[in-house]
UniProtKB/Swiss-Prot annotation:
The record marks R57, R132 as: Interaction with phosphoserine on interacting protein. GO terms for cellular component: cytoplasm. Disulfide bonds: none annotated. Its main location: cytoplasm. Homodimer, and heterodimer with other family members. It is found in: Cytoplasm. Keywords: Cytoplasm. Adapter protein implicated in the regulation of a large spectrum of both general and specialized signaling pathways. Binds to a large number of partners, usually by recognition of a phosphoserine or phosphothreonine motif. Binding generally results in the modulation of the activity of the binding partner. One of its GO terms (biological process) is protein localization. This is 14-3-3 protein gamma-1. Gene3D superfamilies: 14-3-3 domain. It comes from the Eukaryota.
């Protein structure tokens, strides 16, 4: 029998050593024990996979950029090598995302009780995130399917968070942040992205007195990120409008 506490301890240790693959493997084993995760365990799982997938997302972006430049050069051999390498990274990224999505569907979301709104929103947000990461590298029909799954997960989480969580709750705010990024980057819908981010920010500002001392830092950091995105996106839209006016 695997000792749950030992696995969690191993995950903490791996995090300190920045060995995120080991950390993810340990937390995957904890999740597969099929018992509800504590808040700390939930965060360990999230941090582990965020770093594992983050490394692949970063590599994919670098190689995609090189691929575009190489295509312009017209060196066939090099183009083929770069493409093959991008596809290798893509497969790794897809495997990681699928791992997380399986854990969410088979254990985490399934085991949320009727009143565990915070956990449910956390896991549905995570589901939206990992389908979004798949959408970043997918094309054609495959992309359409993962985009739809991402939207569905974010939307369900959003409804639950609005009904059961304070506007200043860091999980509700984090969901709004990522959902708005989904609209902006994946759906290419800047108006929806700005509306969602602005509403979340304004609602939180209006209820600043409900800020929990424990999560004050987290909440205010996410509010700052929402505001930064809004500033960037609205200036981008103005630039686009200006550009169109000049054509």
């Amino acid at each position: 029998m695997v000792d749950r506490e030992q696995l969690v301890q191993k995950a903490r240790l791996a995090e300190q050593a920045e060995r995120y693959d080991d950390m993810a493997a340990a937390m995957k084993s904890v999740t597969e024990l099929n018992e509800a995760l504590s808040n700390e365990e939930r965060n360990l799982l999230s941090v582990a996979y965020k770093n594992v997938v983050g490394a692949r997302r970063s590599s994919w972006r670098v190689i995609s950029s090189i691929e575009q430049k190489t295509s312009a050069d017209g060196n066939e051999k090099k183009i083929e090598m770069v493409r093959a390498y991008r596809e290798k990274i893509e497969k790794e990224l897809e495997t990681v995302c699928q791992d997380v999505l399986n854990l969410l569907d088979n254990f985490l979301i399934k085991n949320c009780g009727e009143t565990q709104h915070e956990s449910k929103v956390f896991y549905l947000k995570m589901k939206g995130d990992y389908y979004r990461y798949l959408a970043e590298v997918a094309t054609g029909e495959k992309r359409a399917a993962v985009v739809e799954s991402s939207e569905k997960s974010y939307s369900e989480a959003h409804e639950i968070s609005k009904e059961h969580m304070q506007p200043t709750h860091p999980i509700r705010l984090g969901l709004a942040l990522n959902y708005s990024v989904f609209y902006y980057e994946i759906q290419n819908a800047p108006e929806q992205a700005c509306h969602l981010a602005k509403t979340a920010f304004d609602d939180a500002i209006a209820e600043l007195d409900t800020l929990n001392e424990d999560s004050y830092k987290d909440s205010t950091l996410i509010m700052q990120l929402l505001r930064d995105n809004l500033t960037l996106w609205t200036s981008d839209q103005q630039d686009d409008e200006g550009g169109e006016g000049n054509n």
